[in-house]
């Protein structure tokens, strides 16, 4: 069995690699680790608004990108390479699948909506 990434997945990796190289250098990682929040809210907002990564595997019917766990793993791999500090794992890897599995249609429509994502981003700025 041979496994190869698709062109779209290669594009995601290249894009993530470039973006994270810009925002998660050694100084940024150290500053985030030393902060009370453990991440830089401005960077988290930028990642969420520009790259839309927290919505990577939210189904399109809820306003997400509708991609799968392979694409999510590509992002996590690149974040690990750069020691990127953010609430990404908690939101995209834990909360989203939990809502998709356990939530009812009404809660999914509310909590997976991109407008709600902005609320979550704002919450991440407070300790």
Q: Which residues does each predicted region cover?
A:
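Intrinsic disorder at enzyme termini
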Residues: 1-8
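Glycine-rich flavin
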Residues: 21-126
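Conserved S/T- and glycine-rich ATP-binding loop of Class I adenylate-forming
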Residues: 9, 20
